[in-house]
Amino acid sequence: MRAEYKDAEALTELVGIIWHDTPEELTEIIRSYMASDDSAVFAEKANGEFIGVALCGLRRDYVEGCDTSPVGYLEGVSIREAYRHRGIARKLVAECEQWAREKGCTEFASDCELTNTASLDFHLHIGFSEENRIICFRKPL
């Protein structure tokens, strides 16, 4: 289901599993995804509590392996541990993919950390193909 603005605080803990900003920052990030026409938040509930969340958006800059623009992009998916391996993440990603199709996208992409083998396995299992591996650098000026 498409999450609503009023759900942002309740989703903060779930998003905090994958992103390590402060709870206040996470709530604002979630709200910004909900407020934009270029992004969406989908969530799943069980027994009255949120057990899964997926955030997606449109990327108009270069996306590894993609030839079109915009590209639908899975920004993050998080499932409570007790509910993993039940198809919930797959369902949420499918909702993101449908949203991207409705936005005119013909490609859908994502990423994960090089060391996150569980995420890599999940992506491959639901039909993504690995396009590239990179290491990012920075230095102060």
Task: Please state what every model-predicted region is.
Residues 1-11:
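A short beta-loop-alpha structural element at the N-terminal edge
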Residues 21-45, 55:
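Active-site rim helix/loop that mediates acceptor-substrate recognition in acyltransferases
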Residues 43, 49-58, 73, 78:
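Conserved beta-strand in the GNAT
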Residues 45, 61-71:
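Conserved acyl-donor/pantetheine-binding loop and adjacent beta-alpha core of acyl/acetyltransferases
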Residues 67-81, 135-136:
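Conserved acetyl-CoA binding element of GNAT-fold acetyltransferases
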Residues 79, 85-98, 121-125:
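Conserved acetyl-CoA-binding loop-helix of GNAT-fold acetyltransferases
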Residues 90, 102, 114-133:
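Conserved active-site alpha-helix within GNAT-family acetyltransferase domains
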Residues 93, 100-112:
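Conserved GNAT acetyl-CoA-binding A-motif
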